Amino acid sequence: MITKKISCTVLGCTLAAALTLTACGGSGSGSSGSMSTGMGGSSSQTTQNAAWRTGLGILTEADGEERAGKINTIAAAVLLDAEGKVADVTLDEMELSLSADSTGKVTMPTDYRTKRQKGDDYPLAAVSSLKKGWTEQADAFGDFLTGKTPDEVKKLATDDDGKPKDADLLSGCTIAVDGYRDAVVRACENAKAVGSARGDRAVLGVSVRNDTKDLTADDDHDVTAQVDITVTALTLDADDRVTGAIADVTEPALTVSADGTVSAPELVKTKLEQGDQYGMRGASALDKEWYEHSEGWCDYLKGRTRAEVASIPDDGSDADLAAVCTISVTELQKAALAAFAEK
């Protein structure tokens, strides 16, 4: 569990967050969305959409010691209303562990599901005083935040173990929430107008790719064990059409030496957080940085249903998509579909 001493921060969605999360709170009707190539709405609707903002927050902690390493990523999708208050929250978390032996051989994890994706396979309910699983408690925390300002969320008190002090919150959530609180705060800080509106709900999707096969370090070469986590925050209207989207990728990597010692980076930035420093523009046919390709992809999703998102070709053959985004969208698409699955 990530505590308030998080050493590596990641904004995130392939943990596309990527790590995808179930919506909490804020339901209703009356939102509107249009396909990226469709007709625009009325001026009053445009004003409403601009007032409601969507945010994605990702925090990652990487840790290495002796012959073991851990990667922990928390993601939050947030919808803020016209007054800047939390209207909906979805949370998720991924915990990954790897090990190495004295010969430098690395053993990677075999299960890349998030806590929300694991469902009953994450056995919290059996040991919970509330007899509630992780998803129930995380959703209860999200519901508790509904109606609060980002500053009020930031000031939410926790004990030394990161667990909430508020009696009302404890009636539905007894897990440590300090990391979730901080991820929600980050999402609020990153929130922007992307087309979301009153009545929408926020969902989160995570997709993980591990291209690491057999890794063994030697005296001449350390090896890098990297996991690519794509996270996508979507807002959906009453018809389950996308009204807004934000997608990000975090790539935490652990280094393993010949004697099996695992070391971790002090800071992990997501691709969105790296901005122009990511360095893609010079190699892009569109002269765009990664975050601009991501924005193009997200705009392209607007107005689409799950089936329509699933039918988007990922081989670059869609001319309209290729005009705004030429990076691989395979993991972005997986994360978006994962978000639909958690609604």
Language model: regions and residue ranges:
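Bacterial N-terminal signal peptides that target proteins for export
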Residues: 1-11
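Bacterial signal peptide processing site
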Residues: 25-28
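A composition-driven surface/loop motif
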Residues: 15-17
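C-terminal motif of bacterial Sec signal peptides marking the signal peptidase cleavage site
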Residues: 19-23
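Active-site- and interface-proximal helix/loop "cap" or "latch" segments in soluble metabolic
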Residues: 46-343
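Low-complexity, Pro/Thr/Ser/Glu-rich flexible segments characteristic
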Residues: 30-48
